Amino acid sequence: MSEPDAPTPLDPAELGFERIRYEKAPPRATITLNRPEVLNAFDFKMLRELARACEDASWDDEIRVVVVTGEGRAFCVGADLRSWGAELIDNPRLYWKWFGAFKDMHDRLREIGKPTVARVQGIAVGGGNELQMACDLAVMADDAFIRHVGPEHGSVPAGGATQWLPIFVGDRRAREVLFLCEEIPAAKAAEWGLVNYAVPRAELDAKVDELVEKLATKLPQTMRYTKQQLNWWRDISWHETVGHARDWLSLSMLNDEAKDAIRAFLASRDDG
């Protein structure tokens, strides 16, 4: 598709997405990660499609709220390590480009200019938790959990977690989440402020609908600037560190520790 002449929103069908579903029912747009066979893990194309959907939603004045969710039993489990193992190990230049797409997706989502709600219907691991933290509000099914596994799999969780977890849950709890790599049940995630609500699965959509209905009544320009002011806390930590993280993680693709950890994880999946 050629580049548009103006910031004109499109019908989702015109965008031809393959890795996500993008739906508009004003005042709501819904972005659904749609790779359930790999627990909605990010590959390069998904990152690009997410960024483009966020751009389109930001251009559409009929859209007042954006909901982000996943298809199947996972919200998102972060990066697709199979694509990493096949393409990025021993290839820091390609990883640098991959992380650029990841960063661009996050920037588009945070700077979308309207409230966003994460509908966390399943597990959120690694970059999946970073994705829900990039949203303004989050509602989580009470049988789901959040977990970070970077220190076990050879990847520093610097795509949002090292920057934002201390803001969300405090420094000590952030270290607990990232160092121990243990599951954080939905109830604890809500208690800690990592999500806003943990609700029974049968009530998940009703709670999301309630938030969307309330948010859609607010003045859009005032909401946009309120969001921008609140984003200062996240943005300052993000912009001060993410460039360094991109370079360091790229070089880590040459490191035996990272390579061995990724290969061991992939071997365990194959054995399972």
Label each region the model flagged:
Residues 1-71, 93, 107:
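Conserved CoA-thioester-binding segment of acyl-CoA-metabolizing enzymes
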Residues 1-26, 181-187, 202, 206-272:
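C-terminal alpha-helix plus adjacent terminal tail
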Residues 9, 14, 19, 70-105, ...:
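Glycine- (often His-adjacent) and acidic-residue-rich active-site loop
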Residues 31, 35, 50, 68, ...:
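Terminal peptide-recognition signature
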Residues 52, 104-107, 210, 247:
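Generic recognition of well-ordered alpha-helical segments
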Residues 78, 99, 103, 126, ...:
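Glycine-rich phosphate-binding loop at the start of an alpha helix
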Residues 107-221:
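Crotonase-fold acyl-CoA enzyme core
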